[in-house]
Amino acid sequence: MTSGRTGILGGSFDPIHYGHLAIAEEVRVLLRLNRVLIIPAREQPLKPGGSVASPAHRLAMARLACADNPFFEVSRIEIDRPDPSYTSVTLQLLHEQGLNDLYLILGIDSVADLPRWREVRRILELAHIVGVARPGAAVDLSHLSQVLPQLPARLIEIDGPRLDISSTDLRQRVAQGRPIRYQTPDAVVAYIEANGLYR
């Protein structure tokens, strides 16, 4: 894996959709990143209930969604690990692979939740935090500097594209027989249909 300014966008991606992709591209362009790693989580520690689709299905959908963007790379780094997908571990592994200029892309609501994350101080040592505004997420971050004094120097706030699309809604729409086209790439729609996901 070549070095350079690298964005990290992790998540369940259950399924991946245009909201994820638009944020990744916005951050890539604004911060002049060499690439963005899309990292599907095997299991998100702070998301109870887990994912609906299997890790293999979510990885496949992410690959299909990113296939036409040469700056996006889908990584198996968390899918292949048996343990929960702790960001601190992932960033450390990427650092050991020579990626030393990392930009962790989070919704601004997730930035507010950082004090609950495992080894958050190590995360801040290993990566810049890119907080992206999302629809319906009016978040006050002023209290965070008291809990995480190093955060202000590592935080980049971006007013990202506000596409009000959620994976939860897409799963519900599929279950109800409603269309999801134009909310996620056609290849992902076809994959969901072909594999009977979310029914």
From Swiss-Prot:
Pathway where it operates: Cofactor biosynthesis; NAD(+) biosynthesis; deamido-NAD(+) from nicotinate D-ribonucleotide: step 1/1
One GO term (biological process): NAD biosynthetic process
InterPro entries on file: Cyt_trans-like, NadD/NMNAT, Rossmann-like_a/b/a_fold
Key words of the record: ATP-binding, NAD, Nucleotide-binding, Nucleotidyltransferase, Pyridine nucleotide biosynthesis, Transferase
Top class in the EC scheme: transferase
One GO MF term: nicotinate-nucleotide adenylyltransferase activity
Catalytic activity field: nicotinate beta-D-ribonucleotide + ATP + H(+) = deamido-NAD(+) + diphosphate
UniProt superkingdom: Bacteria
Gene3D superfamilies given in the database record: HUPs (3.40.50.620)
Role of this protein: Catalyzes the reversible adenylation of nicotinate mononucleotide (NaMN) to nicotinic acid adenine dinucleotide (NaAD).
Similarity comment: family membership: Belongs to the NadD family.
Protein name: Probable nicotinate-nucleotide adenylyltransferase
Top-level taxonomy: Bacteria, Bacillati, Chloroflexota, Chloroflexia, Chloroflexales
